[in-house]
């Protein structure tokens, strides 16, 4: 059986750069293991430039296809530490919410104007902005490139390909993915299916989950 917990900052703690603290990582993993937690849900990494007060940093993907190698190393290190403790991970790749970039950063990168920051501009403005994502082919294409890059990588500490690593319990498409409008429900469902198929084409060995909030994730339409 699995007993899980959220541990979004695992890749950052595993880094030897800004934000990294491997001693703390070891202590936290040892403690979690000691109380029976054996599965951690982890953010692969944040998207977008650093310096946005409401966003996790340091960022992993600082520009489209441009990666902070210290965070990639942190992710690899974190995964290897889980492996040594016989623990597993659920790795999520995107985010509906601004705290790690996600939808809003992909929209900004693909020419939809500056990303809206809810702490500054308000939540209604944010949700109006990010509802463009499910119908933006250019934003979705940038995310597809990110999926290819992450899923296809090899861990530098143990030379195990991610697709072959039993430490991964599941990939998740994103954190709490939402359509953000009724008219987006069908495009959103198609996008989710496309991403799941993309991941499975790269990695037939692991589960793919949505991380949906259920009714909130489908505009209260569970049909």
Functional labels for PLM-detected ranges:
Residues 1-223:
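Active-site mouth of glycoside hydrolases
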């Amino acid at each position: 059986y699995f007993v899980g917990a959220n541990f979004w900052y695992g890749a950052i703690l595993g880094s030897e750069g800004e934000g990294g603290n491997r001693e703390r990582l070891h202590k936290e993993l040892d403690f979690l293991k000691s109380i029976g937690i054996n599965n951690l849900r982890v953010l692969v990494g944040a998207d977008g430039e650093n310096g946005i007060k409401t966003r996790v940093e340091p960022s992993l993907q600082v520009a489209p296809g441009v990666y902070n190698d210290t965070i990639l190393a942190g992710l690899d290190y974190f995964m290897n530490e889980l492996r040594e403790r016989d623990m597993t991970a659920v790795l999520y790749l995107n985010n509906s919410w601004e705290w790690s970039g996600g939808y809003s950063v992909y929209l900004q990168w693909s020419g939809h104007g500056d990303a809206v920051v809810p702490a500054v501009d308000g939540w209604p403005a944010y949700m109006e902005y990010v509802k463009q994502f499910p119908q933006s082919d250019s934003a979705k294409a940038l995310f597809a490139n990110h999926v290819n890059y992450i899923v296809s990588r090899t861990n530098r500490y143990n030379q195990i390909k991610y697709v072959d690593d039993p430490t991964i319990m599941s990939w998740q498409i994103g954190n709490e993915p939402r359509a953000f409008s009724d008219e987006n429900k069908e495009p959103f469902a198609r996008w989710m299916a496309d991403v799941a198929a993309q991941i499975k084409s790269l990695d037939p060995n692991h589960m793919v989950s949505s991380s949906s909030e259920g009714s909130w994730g489908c505009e209260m339409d569970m049909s």
